[in-house]
Swiss-Prot record:
Glycans are attached at N110. Residues 25-308 are extracellular. Disulfide bonds join C125-C188, C227-C283. Heterodimer of an alpha chain and a beta chain (beta-2-microglobulin). This is Class I histocompatibility antigen, Gogo-C*0201 alpha chain. Residues 1-24 form the signal peptide. One of its GO terms (cellular component) is extracellular space.
Amino acid sequence: MRVMAPRTLILPLSGALALTETWAGSHSMRYFYTSVSRPGRGEPRFISVGYVDDTQFVRFDSDAASPRGEPRAPWVEQEGPEYWDRETQKYKRQAQTDRVNLRKLRGYYNQSEDGSHTLQSMYGCDLGPDGRLLRGYSQFAYDGKDYIALNEDLRSWTAADTAAQVTQRKWEAARVAEQERAYLEGLCVEWLRRYLENGKETLQRAEPPKTHVTHHPLSDHEATLRCWALGFYPAEITLTWQRDGEDQTQDTELVETRPAGDGTFQKWAAVVVPSGQEQRYTCHMQHEGLPEPLTLRWEPSSQPTIPIVGIVVGLAVLVVLAVLGAVVTAMMCRRKSSGGKGGSCSQAACSNSAQGSDESLITCKA
C-alpha cells in the first residue's frame, strides 16, 4: 500500500541551488496525507498538506468544490500551471490509492465495512546548514496507531504489528526501501532547496519573541510565574526556569509550541514558587532571532497584559493542524528517482503511477 508524496516538479533545478548553497540552521520539508473512510457516504475524504519548516505551502482536499492542489504560500504561487496540474493529478491518484488501501487494511484487521477508518502518512527530509540530507522520513499509521515506518538508515522497516509485517515482507521483496532512499536523498533534497531559495524572504527570516513574565497568585503561600514567548519564527525555541542559577526542569510546566495563526508561534513555561521568593527565579530564553539568550524576571511593578485572543486563535489553529496532520506511520513507497521520468517497476507490490510527474513515486499496495 502506498501514499503518494507531493514531489512537485520534475524540472531541472537551477545552478543557484547547487549543493554548495548554504542556509542558516537546519530546514525540513514534510507532507502529511490523511484519508478517512465514510461508509454509505461516498468515497473516503483525502486531505494533503505540505510544509517547509513551519510554513504550510500546499493543500489539497478531495471534498472541495473543485479539488485542486492549492498554494498556501506566496513563494509557491510563482510555479506555473503545469506544476499545479501535476500536483492535482498526483493527489487524485493518491486518493484512489488510499481508497484501495483502506479496504485492504480493513481486511488485514478483520474489520466490518460499517465503521469509519483513517489512513495517515508523513514523509519528507531534513537538511543541515550545508544543504545536505540530515534525515529522511516515510511513516504510516492506521486508525491513529503506528503501522509501518522507514528506519533512520533508510534501508529497513519497522512494522508495528503482524498486519504491518505482511506489508513489510512485500516491500522488502520489492526493494521499496531503496526507492524511498533514492527519493529522499535526491528529489526531496533538491525540491526543499528550491523552495528555500524561492521563499527565502519568508522561510529564512528570524522574528524574535516578544517576552513577558506574569504572576498568578495561587494562595497566600504560592504563586505561578509564567514566562511567555510570543510572535516568534521559526518555531524552535528554548524556555527554562532557574532558581538561584539551578535548572528547575522537573518543576516546570512547559506547553508545546503553538501556531499563532499569523505565521508566527507562541510558547510559555510556568513554575510554582513560594510567595515572596519570586526574585530568586529567572526565565532563560534562546531563539534564532535573539542576538543572545535572554534572562527574564518577574517585575512586580508592571504586570503585562497577555493577548489572550491571540492565544485562543493559536490554540484553534493547533487543533486544525493536529486533525489534518496528526501523522506518524501508515504505508507508502515511491518509484526510483530517474530525473523525474517514470521508471520501470515490476514489483508485485507496486505499480508505477508517476509518469511525467515529479513525484518520483510508485503506488504500492499493502
